[in-house]
C-alpha cells in the first residue's frame, strides 16, 4: 500500500454511486447466500449420562429424539439454488443503498452532518464512564489479560473446548432448519411442519400485516432505478479496496495473513466511500427519524414466524437476519445507547428495531401464557445474524418489563449473530440469569460475530470518537478496543475441510465445541482472553481485504449463510453417529471375547467333572456359552448362503 494517494475524484465510476467503507461494516447481519469423565466407558454409553447442555431441556426432561429430516417443511437446498442473488442479501449493494439514503437525509436536514464541532454542540456534557459502567471486570481487559492473550497457545485454547453431545447437536440442527425457514415464510406448509417437525404453525409477521390491513411499502420500480446505478463488480471492488487500505495500516492487530498491494486507481475509489460515515456522523434528528422507521409496522427490519410444540408447551419465535433495506439501516446505526434505562450499553439500531418487534410479538406471548398457564408455558427465541440479536433483546425486554416470568424463558439460541452489548454478562447476573441463557453458535470463520468484538485499530477508534460523541465515553472501546463485548456462552462450529479450511485454534475435522471454563476468577480471565483470541483470528479486516470473500460464492456468504450452519451441523451429527457406532461395535467385540474366555474356562471345568464322574451322558454343546453357539450357527449359515449365491453367478 506504499504510494497510495487519496484522490477527491473517482476514475471510471459514475459520481451517482454513493458507497461506504466496508472496513467498518464487517458484513453485519446478512444472510448472503464438557469433556467426558467416564474414561472407562465407551462414548456411546457415557454420552447418554453426561449432559453439559442439560439446561436446554424443559423441566429436566429431554426433548423427542430424532435427527433432522431432509424432506422437511421446505426443501432448503432447492430454495438456495433458485434464490436470486438480489434476493439473498447482497450486503455490499445494501450498504451502498443505505449510504445514498442517509446522505440524502443529511442534505435535507440542512447540514453537512456531523463534524466534530457540530457533534460537540449537540451532545450534552457526557456522562462519566463510571455512571454507565461501574468498576467491574465485565468491560475491562487489563495489561495482564493482553499478555495472556498473546501468550495463549493452541493447546491452551483447546483445553477450554468441550464437544457438544449428539442429541444437543440434533436440537441445534432442528432450530437452524426452522431459522432457515424464516427466509421463506410464504413457502412454509403448515401440514409439512406438523408432520416432520411436530410443530404447529401459529402466525407470522406477514400474516400480522395482512390482518391489520397494512399495505407493505413496496417501491419496486424506484428500487430498480437505484440498483441500475450500482454495478456489483464496482461495489465489490470498492469494498475490497477500502478494507485493504485500512488493513495495511492495521497489521499489528492481525494474528495471521499479510497485506496486499493495491494500485493508485483502485485506492482512489475510497474517496466516495462515505456510507458508514454518513450514518455515524448524522445529526440526531436524522437518526431519530430512522429509529422511528425501524419501530414501525409498515416496514419491519426482519420477518419472523411463530410455531408451537404442543407436547412440551413451548412456543418458538424465529427471526430472520438482514434481508431488507430497513435491516441494513439498523445494522449501520451502531452507536451505543443505554438499554432499558440500565447501566448497560447496547447497539442503537438493533435496539430500536427490537422495540418494534417486541410490540408485534407481545400479543402472541400473552396468548400462549394465558392458554397454557405461566407454570406450563415456555418461550424459545432464536434467530440468525441480526435476527439472533433481536431475539436476545426481545427476550430480555419481556423479563425486564415484567411481562414474562424468568421460569418461562428458555435459553436464547443464535446463529452467526454479532455481539451488541457492553456489559451483557453483568446484566444477566443482575437479572438472576446464568450465562447459559444465551447460546451463541458461531461458524469458525464467520465474519459477523467478529464484527463488533474484534480489536479496532486506534485510527478507527479515534475516527469514531471524532464523528460521534457517544463513542468518546464508550467503556468497551476505551478499555478493550472493541465496540461490544461477548456475552453468554460461545459455541464454535467447524464444518468439514471440503466446505471451508479448518481454523488454526480448533482440532482438525468437523465438530461443535463449547468454549467454557470453571467458575473461578482466574479461569474467567482466561476465558475472556480466549474469546478475544478467537474473534481476532482471523481479523475481519483480513477477511475483507481478500477478494475471494466477495460475491455469491465468496467466503463471507459461505461462512455466514444460514443454510451453511444447517449443513455443517448435519455433517457433524452424521460424523458423530458414525463414530459412536464404530466405538460401540468395537466395545461389543471386546466384551464378547472376554465373556467367551471366562465362560469357556468354567464350561471346560464342568465338562471334565461330569466326564470323570460318569454320572450322565451329556452333550458338550450345552456347556458352551450361548453367544458362541449363536455366532457359530450364524457363521455356518452365512458360509452356505455365500456358496449358494456364488453358485448362481
From Swiss-Prot:
Residues at the active site: 385, 446, 560
GO cellular component, one term: chloroplast membrane
Keyword Chloroplast among record annotations: yes
Entry EC number(s): 3.1.1.32, 3.1.1.26
Bilayer topology term: Peripheral membrane protein
Top-rank lineage group of the source organism: Eukaryota
PROSITE patterns: LIPASE_SER
Catalytic reaction(s) noted: a 1,2-diacyl-3-O-(beta-D-galactosyl)-sn-glycerol + 2 H2O = 3-beta-D-galactosyl-sn-glycerol + 2 a fatty acid + 2 H(+); a 1,2-diacyl-sn-glycero-3-phosphocholine + H2O = a 2-acyl-sn-glycero-3-phosphocholine + a fatty acid + H(+); 1-hexadecanoyl-2-(9Z-octadecenoyl)-sn-glycero-3-phosphocholine + H2O = 2-(9Z-octadecenoyl)-sn-glycero-3-phosphocholine + hexadecanoate + H(+); 1-(9Z-octadecenoyl)-2-hexadecanoyl-sn-glycero-3-phosphocholine + H2O = 2-hexadecanoyl-sn-glycero-3-phosphocholine + (9Z)-octadecenoate + H(+)
Subcellular location(s) of the protein: Plastid, Chloroplast membrane
UniProt-listed GO biological process terms: defense response to insect; lipid catabolic process; positive regulation of defense response
GO molecular function, one term: galactolipase activity
Motif extent (GXSXG): 383-387
Residue numbers spanned by region Disordered: 104-128
Induction profile: Induced by abscisic acid (ABA) and cold stress.
Transit peptide: 1-26
Protein keywords: Chloroplast, Hydrolase, Lipid degradation, Lipid metabolism, Membrane, Plastid, Transit peptide
Enzyme category, top tier: hydrolase
SUPFAM superfamilies (alphabetical): alpha/beta-Hydrolases
Function statement: Sn-1-specific phospholipase A1 that catalyzes the initial step of oxylipins and jasmonate (JA) biosynthesis. Hydrolyzes polyunsaturated acyl groups preferentially from chloroplastic phosphatidylglycerol (PG). May function downstream of abscisic acid (ABA), and provide a link between ABA-mediated abiotic stress responses and oxylipin and JA signalings. In vitro, possesses broad substrate specificity.
Record-stated family: Belongs to the AB hydrolase superfamily. Lipase family.
Additional remarks: Plants overexpressing PLIP3 exhibit stunted growth and accumulate anthocyanin under normal growth conditions.
Protein name per Swiss-Prot or TrEMBL: Phospholipase A1 PLIP3, chloroplastic
Gene it is expressed from: PLIP3
Amino acid at each position: 500500500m506504499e504510494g497510495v494517494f487519496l484522490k477527491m475524484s473517482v476514475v471510471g465510476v459514475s459520481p451517482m454511486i454513493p458507497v461506504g467503507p466496508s472496513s467498518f461494516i464487517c458484513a453485519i447481519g446478512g444472510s448472503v447466500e464438557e469433556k467426558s469423565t467416564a474414561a472407562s466407558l465407551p462414548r456411546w454409553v457415557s454420552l447418554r449420562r453426561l449432559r453439559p447442555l442439560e439446561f436446554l431441556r424443559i423441566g429436566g426432561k429431554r426433548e423427542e429424539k430424532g435427527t433432522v429430516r431432509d424432506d422437511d417443511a421446505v426443501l432448503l437446498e432447492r430454495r438456495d439454488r433458485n434464490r436470486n442473488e438480489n434476493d439473498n442479501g447482497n450486503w455490499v449493494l445494501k450498504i451502498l443503498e443505505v449510504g445514498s439514503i442517509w446522505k440524502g437525509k443529511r442534505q435535507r436536514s440542512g447540514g453537512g452532518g456531523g463534524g466534530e464541532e457540530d457533534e460537540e454542540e449537540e451532545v450534552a456534557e457526557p456522562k462519566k464512564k463510571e455512571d454507565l459502567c461501574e468498576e467491574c471486570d465485565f468491560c475491562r481487559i487489563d495489561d495482564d489479560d493482553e499478555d495472556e492473550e498473546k501468550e495463549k497457545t493452541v493447546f491452551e485454547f483447546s483445553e477450554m473446548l468441550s464437544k457438544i453431545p449428539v442429541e444437543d447437536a440434533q436440537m441445534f440442527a432442528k432450530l437452524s432448519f426452522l431459522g432457515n425457514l424464516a427466509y421463506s415464510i410464504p413457502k412454509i406448509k403448515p401440514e409439512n411442519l406438523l408432520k416432520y417437525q411436530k410443530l404447529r404453525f401459529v402466525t407470522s409477521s406477514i400474516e400480522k400485516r395482512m390482518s391489520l390491513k397494512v399495505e407493505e411499502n413496496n417501491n419496486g420500480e424506484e428500487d430498480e432505478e437505484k440498483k441500475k446505478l450500482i454495478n456489483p463488480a464496482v461495489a465489490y471492488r470498492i469494498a475490497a479496496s477500502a478494507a485493504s487500505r485500512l488493513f495495511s495500516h492495521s497489521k499489528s492487530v492481525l494474528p495471521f495473513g499479510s497485506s496486499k498491494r493495491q494500485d493508485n486507481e483502485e485506492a482512489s475509489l475510497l474517496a466516495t466511500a462515505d456510507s458508514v460515515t454518513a450514518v455515524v456522523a448524522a445529526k440526531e434528528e436524522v437518526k431519530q427519524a430512522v429509529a422511528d422507521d425501524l419501530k414501525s409496522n409498515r416496514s419491519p427490519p426482519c420477518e419472523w414466524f411463530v410455531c408451537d410444540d404442543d407436547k412440551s408447551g413451548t412456543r418458538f419465535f424465529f427471526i430472520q437476519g438482514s434481508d431488507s433495506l430497513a435491516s441494513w439501516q439498523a445494522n449501520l446505526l451502531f452507536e451505543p445507547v443505554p438499554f432499558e434505562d440500565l447501566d448497560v450499553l447496547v447497539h442503537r439500531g438493533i435496539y430500536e428495531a427490537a422495540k418494534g418487534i417486541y410490540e408485534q410479538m407481545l400479543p402472541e406471548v400473552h396468548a400462549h401464557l394465558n392458554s397454557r398457564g405461566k407454570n406450563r408455558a415456555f418461550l424459545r427465541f432464536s434467530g440468525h445474524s441480526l435476527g439472533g440479536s433481536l431475539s436476545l433483546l426481545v427476550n430480555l425486554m419481556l423479563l425486564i418489563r415484567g411481562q414474562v416470568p424468568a421460569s418461562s424463558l428458555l435459553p436464547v439460541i443464535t446463529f452467526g449473530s454479532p455481539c451488541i452489548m457492553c456489559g451483557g454478562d453483568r446484566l444477566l447476573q443482575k437479572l438472576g440469569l446464568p450465562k447459559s441463557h444465551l447460546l451463541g453458535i458461531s461458524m469458525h470463520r464467520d465474519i459477523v460475530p467478529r464484527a463488533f468484538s474484534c480489536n479496532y485499530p486506534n485510527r478507527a477508534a479515534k475516527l469514531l470518537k471524532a464523528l460521534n460523541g457517544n463513542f468518546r465515553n464508550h467503556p468497551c472501546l476505551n478499555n478493550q478496543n472493541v465496540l461490544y463485548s461477548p456475552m453468554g456462552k460461545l459455541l464454535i462450529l467447524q464444518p468439514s475441510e471440503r466446505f471451508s479450511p479448518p481454523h488454526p485454534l480448533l482440532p482438525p475435522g468437523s465438530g461443535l465445541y463449547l468454549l467454557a471454563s470453571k467458575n473461578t476468577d482466574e479461569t474467567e480471565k482466561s476465558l475472556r482472553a480466549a474469546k478475544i483470541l478467537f474473534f481476532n483470528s482471523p481479523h475481519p479486516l483480513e477477511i475483507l481485504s481478500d477478494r475471494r470473500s466477495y460475491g455469491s460464492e465468496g467466503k463471507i456468504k459461505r461462512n455466514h449463510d444460514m443454510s451453511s450452519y444447517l449443513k455443517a451441523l448435519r455433517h457433524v451429527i452424521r460424523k458423530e453417529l458414525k463414530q459412536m457406532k464404530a466405538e460401540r461395535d468395537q466395545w461389543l467385540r471386546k466384551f464378547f471375547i472376554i465373556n467367551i474366555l471366562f465362560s469357556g474356562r468354567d464350561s471346560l471345568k464342568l465338562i471334565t467333572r461330569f466326564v470323570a464322574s460318569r454320572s450322565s451322558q451329556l452333550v458338550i454343546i450345552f456347556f458352551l456359552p450361548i453367544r458362541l453357539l449363536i455366532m457359530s450357527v450364524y457363521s455356518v449359515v452365512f458360509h452356505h448362503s455365500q456358496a449358494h449365491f456364488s453358485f448362481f453367478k
